């Protein structure tokens, strides 16, 4: 079994490619199940955010795994494999694990040190667990990376004063308008990104905020938190006509702000309008950027603002490299020890079988034993067995991570009289439990 990661992110693909390869939240479970049915795929988790789409998989062979991951992506998004291949990256084994540690801790994010990705990775893992597409390896790996990410944010300054995409949006508005006092803002969408944007807007002193959302109750809930107004979705253009700044972040699959409508609207509008599209797929047609006085920014346009004050956090990332490498080594040592688990269980079961035979013999030869005496003898015998096996099992685990592990383990089995059948039975039981 091998760990293989395939994906694309803000490093490898522009937004016009990324937005075509986003898994819809309503289709997450179906995507996981479909991928699990591909040849070579043993376990899988899909992470899909505004800046990355990545698949972490356990495969039976690296070469075939790479092919079937690519084929799945091409089929799912109905695109030619050759068209998406230039934007994809692959990480294998230790590189894949190292990458996941960095992603989860926010060390590979557009916003260095941001914590939102931690929640997104946890969500992706939980969905995969519920859908039964994870097993022994990915369950262990994702628990470890989530724990590590929490420690990083708690014990370092990586997320201290970290800018966010929504923060960058406010900074762009300040550069264009100077003071944001008395500026009218319209926020389209009422999800997590919209809430983060509102937090930054409130911190900038803006008070004239209108929230528009297709589901009005969601807009009302958000508006109540920030003393904002709620606008009717069907009257969106009327609100845009009065707006100075528009932030758009919805889960719509197609643009909701169209070039033709905006061309007409801007001809009626007396002032310029800043439109910041932080949705993926994008919520505003790109051709709107050609309309006079219509200043359009998308996520990639905000990148320069986001990275402007990240020098200190980049230093923290470098300092964490050795720690991550240590975590990666620990994971693969644990994985190697997985191979001896059936041997350990077979040894314990053999010892317990011997105890059971001995206790039956004692019962026959010493019929005068009381029930209490019989139980006490059994407990002491089990204690002796555990003490006798403790050191050999510890040595076996050490052997499992050495270069000549296979030979050493075979010697161990022969010394303790463990047959191939003894171990195979345990392995089959484990496989049935995992499935």
Swiss-Prot record:
One BP annotation, GO: protoporphyrinogen IX biosynthetic process
GO MF: glutamyl-tRNA reductase activity; NADP binding
CDD domains: NAD_bind_Glutamyl_tRNA_reduct
Residues that, per the record, bind substrate: 49-52, 109, 114-116, 120
Domain of life: Bacteria
Pathway: Porphyrin-containing compound metabolism; protoporphyrin-IX biosynthesis; 5-aminolevulinate from L-glutamyl-tRNA(Glu): step 1/2
Annotated catalytic residues: 50
Residue positions binding NADP(+): 189-194
One Pfam family linked to the record: Shikimate_DH
EC number(s) stated in the UniProt entry for this protein: 1.2.1.70
UniProt catalytic activity: (S)-4-amino-5-oxopentanoate + tRNA(Glu) + NADP(+) = L-glutamyl-tRNA(Glu) + NADPH + H(+)
Record site: Important for activity: 99
Keywords noted in UniProt: NADP, Oxidoreductase, Porphyrin biosynthesis
Additional facts recorded: During catalysis, the active site Cys acts as a nucleophile attacking the alpha-carbonyl group of tRNA-bound glutamate with the formation of a thioester intermediate between enzyme and glutamate, and the concomitant release of tRNA(Glu). The thioester intermediate is finally reduced by direct hydride transfer from NADPH, to form the product GSA.
Function: Catalyzes the NADPH-dependent reduction of glutamyl-tRNA(Glu) to glutamate 1-semialdehyde (GSA).
Record note on domains: Possesses an unusual extended V-shaped dimeric structure with each monomer consisting of three distinct domains arranged along a curved 'spinal' alpha-helix. The N-terminal catalytic domain specifically recognizes the glutamate moiety of the substrate. The second domain is the NADPH-binding domain, and the third C-terminal domain is responsible for dimerization.
Family as reported in the entry's similarity comment: Belongs to the glutamyl-tRNA reductase family.
Subunit composition and interactions: Homodimer.
HAMAP family for the chain: Glu_tRNA_reductase
Designated name of the protein: Glutamyl-tRNA reductase
Native source species: Listeria monocytogenes serotype 4a (strain HCC23)
Gene (UniProt): hemA
């Amino acid at each position: 079994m091998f760990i293989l990661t395939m994906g694309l992110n803000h490093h490898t693909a522009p937004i016009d490619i990324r937005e075509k390869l986003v898994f819809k939240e309503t289709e997450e479970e179906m995507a996981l199940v479909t991928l699990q049915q591909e040849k070579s795929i043993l376990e899988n988790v899909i992470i899909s955010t505004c800046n990355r789409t990545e698949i972490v998989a356990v495969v039976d062979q690296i070469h075939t795994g790479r092919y079937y991951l690519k084929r799945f992506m091409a089929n799912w998004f109905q695109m030619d494999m050759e068209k998406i291949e230039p934007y994809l990256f692959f990480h294998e084994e230790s590189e894949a694990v190292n990458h996941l540690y960095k992603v989860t801790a926010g060390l590979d994010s557009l916003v260095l040190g941001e914590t939102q990705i931690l929640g997104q990775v946890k969500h992706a893992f939980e969905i995969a667990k519920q859908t039964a597409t994870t097993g022994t390896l990915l369950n262990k790996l994702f628990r470890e990376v989530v724990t590590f990410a929490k420690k990083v944010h708690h014990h370092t300054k990586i997320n201290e004063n970290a800018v966010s995409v929504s923060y960058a949006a406010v900074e762009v508005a300040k550069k264009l308008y100077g003071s944001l006092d008395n500026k009218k803002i319209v926020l389209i969408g009422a999800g997590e990104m919209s809430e983060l944007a509102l937090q930054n807007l409130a911190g900038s002193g803006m008070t004239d905020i209108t929230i528009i959302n297709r589901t009005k109750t969601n807009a009302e809930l958000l508006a109540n938190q920030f003393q904002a107004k709620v606008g009717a979705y069907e009257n969106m253009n009327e609100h845009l006509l009065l707006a100075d700044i528009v932030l758009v972040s919805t889960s719509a699959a197609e643009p909701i702000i169209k070039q033709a409508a905006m061309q007409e609207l801007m001809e009626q509008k007396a002032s310029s309008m800043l439109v910041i599209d932080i949705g993926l797929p994008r919520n505003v047609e790109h051709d709107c950027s050609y309309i006079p006085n219509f200043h359009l920014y998308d996520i990639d346009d905000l990148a320069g603002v986001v990275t402007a004050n990240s020098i200190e956090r980049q230093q923290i990332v470098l300092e964490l490299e050795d720690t991550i490498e240590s975590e990666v080594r620990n994971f693969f040592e644990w994985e190697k020890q997985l191979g001896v688990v059936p041997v350990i269980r077979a040894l314990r079961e053999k010892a317990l079988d011997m105890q059971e035979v001995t206790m039956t013999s004692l019962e026959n030869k010493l019929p005068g034993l009381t029930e209490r005496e019989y139980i006490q003898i059994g407990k002491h015998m089990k204690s002796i067995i555990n003490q006798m096996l403790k050191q050999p099992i510890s040595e076996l685990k050490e052997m499992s991570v050495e270069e000549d592990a296979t030979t050493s383990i075979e010697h161990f089995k022969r010394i303790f009289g463990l047959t191939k059948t003894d171990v195979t039975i345990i392995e089959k039981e484990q496989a049935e439990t995992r499935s």
